[in-house]
Swiss-Prot record:
Binding site for ATP: 172-179
Any single GO CC term annotated in Swiss-Prot or TrEMBL for this entry: chloroplast thylakoid membrane
Organism: Pteridium esculentum (Bracken fern)
Purpose: Produces ATP from ADP in the presence of a proton gradient across the membrane. The catalytic sites are hosted primarily by the beta subunits.
Entry keyword set: ATP synthesis, ATP-binding, CF(1), Chloroplast, Hydrogen ion transport, Ion transport, Membrane, Nucleotide-binding, Plastid, Thylakoid, Translocase, Transport
Keyword Plastid among record annotations: yes
Gene, per the UniProt record: atpB
Listed GO MF terms: ATP binding; ATP hydrolysis activity; proton-transporting ATP synthase activity, rotational mechanism
Disulfide cross-links: none
Main EC class the enzyme belongs to: translocase
SUPFAM superfamilies: C-terminal domain of alpha and beta subunits of F1 ATP synthase, N-terminal domain of alpha and beta subunits of F1 ATP synthase, P-loop containing nucleoside triphosphate hydrolases
Membership in a protein family: Belongs to the ATPase alpha/beta chains family.
Protein name: ATP synthase subunit beta, chloroplastic
Subunit structure: F-type ATPases have 2 components, CF(1) - the catalytic core - and CF(0) - the membrane proton channel. CF(1) has five subunits: alpha(3), beta(3), gamma(1), delta(1), epsilon(1). CF(0) has four main subunits: a(1), b(1), b'(1) and c(9-12).
Amino acid sequence: IVTKTSFLSFEISELVKKNVGYITQIIGPVLDVASSPGKMPNIYNSLIIKGQNSAGQELNVTCEVQQLLGNNEVRAVAMSATDGLTRGMGAVDTGAPLSVPVGETTLGRISNVLGEPVDNLGPVQSSTTFPIHRSAPAFIQLDTKLSIFETGIKVVDLSAPYRRGGKIGLFGGAGVGKTVLITELINNIAKAHGGVSVSGGVGERTREGNDPYMEMKESKVINEQNISESKVALVYGQMNEPPGASMRVGSTASTMAEYFRDVNKQDVLPFIDYILRFVQAGSEVSALLGRMPSAVGYQPTLGTEMGSSQERITSTKDGSITSIQAVYVPADDLTDPAPATTSAHLDATTVLSRGLAAKGIYPAVDPLDSTSTMSQPWIVGEEHYETAQGVKQTSQRYKELQDIIAILGLDELSEEDRLTVARARKIERFSSQPSFVAEVFTGSPGKYVSLPETIKGFQMILPGELDNLPEQA
């Protein structure tokens, strides 16, 4: 008789159970496991450790093989806490990489890095699983069409428009509005485009995971009454979990998004919040695996790890994946290796300014620092391009004049410069926009502004049609 133990998508038969190793060393979340001669697990295979701790509580830890050490030993990284594990405990090689449930049944649910639900709504009823390590699509499969992805957010659509099927980075320090902007984008895209989103929370704090979840339920992006009508699947690797979980939760989210693209042939929006914590988790794991650190203490494989994860997030002829990634900028330094490495892969960058946030202008997007490969007249059209350039030129001149204004005052400027300053301030205030997901805090109903309306509004400010109106108007 062959007995089977169900674990996620794996059914570990007695035949596989014969490939059992044992723990020889535990260093925090990193484990060394000895296996039988000739039966060493492959790189990225998942190992399952079951047993009891000293208090008699059941333990169930999944690890991923990272290094083959020789002498029939491998080094693995745990995906959950290793508290209670002891040397000599058995470790079962599943014979395959970690696989997670995919498909419509994941919508409206919160899963961890292993694909297990953590929202107390019962198991995810999915018969389909995908391994989290998958190859990027071949070049011949890629979709090379260029089209704008309208977000309904004025300053984004005008200054640095997003490409459908592109990769977008939201750059900003702490507290400038990255998470709110991501949640607003999920809301707008679900309602205006009818697409599905996958939100990958990498190293999330409680607030960062809980607040968007509650806001999505309020805005019906997650439908509690009929969960199957939800438009987003959430995957969280929490901050209190080992670095292995944060390092792989992005791969789990990408895998779920790839199913909607490749099988359902849908347009998908994976949101990664934050990509920096993926880098930090990789740095921790790299140090624990004994690799020499590189610049600023980051892992020497930073470029390779970033490239392998980013290349999977792409559009094919079957469907598009438009990825939006929040990039925390340490100490507001854009030259730090983490944001610098990330920006090399992006089609558009939306930079959030602390100065604008301090003025109460939200979303605090800086049109001068934000860039997009779509900002070309032959892609967006002459009218859009000229308007965006006019906004940037006016904002740049205002920025140049700020030191003079601070020292000598506004009255010392020429008439032309005073007009420029007045128009730049109107542009700043016109760029702000009430958010759907922040209605409960601001008391102002959210607004979705189409691209033609956005262009028309800025075109009225630039030549001075609205010079007679006060800034507050």
